[in-house]
């Protein structure tokens, strides 16, 4: 029996013998295997939560050498850019326009008084009393221009504007020129002036002027009822604001020598003046 098994085994091909009796030996694991089944669901179902171990993190801190009494490795002081900044052209133009606009606003001036001829009745009374009165005044680029009305007391007459640019530390007299008026009566004459403003005016100085009328050896002044005609910077006008009218009505009615009430300052302040709503042009 043993002989038959041995002969049968020896008669087999080598490949058949290896495939039939060969087997693999699994290597011995070096580390213990972890179970693939997790028990988290079981713990959650039972209502118990496995405790987790919280690791304590170490906070990071930054300290400099000079705080520890040591010397710094390198110290560099920046005074100017080594290379010029390459600013785009459109941004450069925008910055230049903003600077120029700010400068122009700070150098612009406005009139600090209303047009005298806006209230026709008051203007006529002042002309009758003082014999001279500023009619209109406008500010142009760097000049001030206007017209003056005077009573025709004599043929020979002189009209001038006395103006100061440094709060009356000094002043200059600017002559006015006669303007032929077709529609004006023979009892009134019109003069005009055009005064150039200095290039540099100190911000703390005031610009003021008054009108002088000389005739028959007499001198008459229009100083805006003692306040003078002032020219201020535009930025000051925005900060000062406009005066608020009184809450109650003014029942004081002033009558002029011509018998007409001054409705502009009497019972009817809301009525428009003779000139109209704009109140910018001459009364005639």
From Swiss-Prot:
UniProt short sequence motif PP1-binding motif, positions renumbered to this chain: 61-64
Keyword annotations from UniProtKB, A to Z: Carbohydrate metabolism, Glycogen metabolism, Phosphoprotein
Pfam family, one: CBM_21
Phosphoserine: residues bearing it: 260
GO molecular function: glycogen binding; protein phosphatase 1 binding; protein phosphatase regulator activity
A cellular component annotation (GO) from this entry: protein phosphatase type 1 complex
Record domain CBM21: where: 124-232
Superkingdom of the source species: Eukaryota
GO biological process: glycogen metabolic process; negative regulation of glycogen catabolic process; positive regulation of glycogen biosynthetic process; regulation of glycogen biosynthetic process
InterPro entries for this protein: CBM21_dom (IPR005036), CBM21_dom_sf (IPR038175), Pase-1_reg-su_3B/C/D_met (IPR017434), PP1_3B (IPR030682), PP1_regulatory_subunit_3 (IPR050782)
Presence of the UniProt keyword Cell membrane in the record: no
Complex and partners: Interacts with glycogen, PPP1CC catalytic subunit of PP1 and PYGL. Associates with glycogen particles. Forms complexes with debranching enzyme, glycogen phosphorylase, glycogen synthase and phosphorylase kinase which is necessary for its regulation of PP1 activity.
Function, in words: Acts as a glycogen-targeting subunit for phosphatase PP1. Facilitates interaction of the PP1 with enzymes of the glycogen metabolism and regulates its activity. Suppresses the rate at which PP1 dephosphorylates (inactivates) glycogen phosphorylase and enhances the rate at which it activates glycogen synthase and therefore limits glycogen breakdown. Its activity is inhibited by PYGL, resulting in inhibition of the glycogen synthase and glycogen phosphorylase phosphatase activities of PP1. Dramatically increases basal and insulin-stimulated glycogen synthesis upon overexpression in hepatocytes.
Domain notes: The N-terminal region is required for binding to PP1, the central region is required for binding to glycogen and the C-terminal region is required for binding to PYGL.
Name of this protein: Protein phosphatase 1 regulatory subunit 3B
Native source organism of the sequence: Bos taurus (Bovine)
């Amino acid at each position: 029996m043993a002989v038959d098994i041995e002969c049968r085994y020896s008669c087999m091909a080598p490949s058949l013998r290896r495939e039939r009796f060969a087997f693999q030996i699994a290597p011995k694991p070096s580390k213990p295997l972890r179970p693939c089944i997790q028990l988290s669901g079981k713990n959650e179902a039972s209502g118990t939560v496995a405790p987790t171990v919280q690791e304590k993190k170490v906070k990071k801190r930054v300290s400099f050498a000079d705080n520890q009494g040591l010397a710094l490795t390198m110290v560099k002081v920046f005074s100017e850019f080594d290379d010029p900044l390459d600013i785009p052209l459109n941004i450069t133009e925008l910055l230049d326009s903003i600077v120029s606009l700010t400068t122009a606003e700070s150098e612009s001036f406005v009139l600090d008084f209303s047009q005298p001829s806006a209230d026709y009745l008051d203007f006529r009374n002042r002309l009758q009393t003082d014999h001279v009165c500023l009619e209109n005044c406008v500010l142009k680029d760097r000049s001030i221009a206007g017209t003056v009305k005077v009573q025709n007391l004599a043929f020979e007459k002189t009209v001038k504007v006395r103006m100061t640019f440094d709060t009356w530390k000094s002043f200059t007299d600017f002559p006015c020129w006669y303007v032929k008026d077709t529609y004006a009566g023979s009892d009134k004459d019109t003069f005009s002036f055009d005064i150039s403003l200095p290039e540099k005016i100190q911000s703390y100085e005031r610009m003021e002027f008054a009108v002088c009328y000389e005739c028959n050896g007499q001198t008459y002044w229009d100083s805006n009822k003692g306040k003078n005609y002032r020219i201020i910077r535009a930025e000051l006008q925005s900060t000062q604001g406009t005066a608020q009218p009184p809450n109650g009505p003014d029942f004081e009615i002033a009558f002029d020598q011509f018998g007409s009430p001054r409705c502009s300052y009497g019972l009817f302040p809301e009525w428009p003046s003779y000139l109209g709503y704009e109140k910018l042009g001459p009364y005639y």
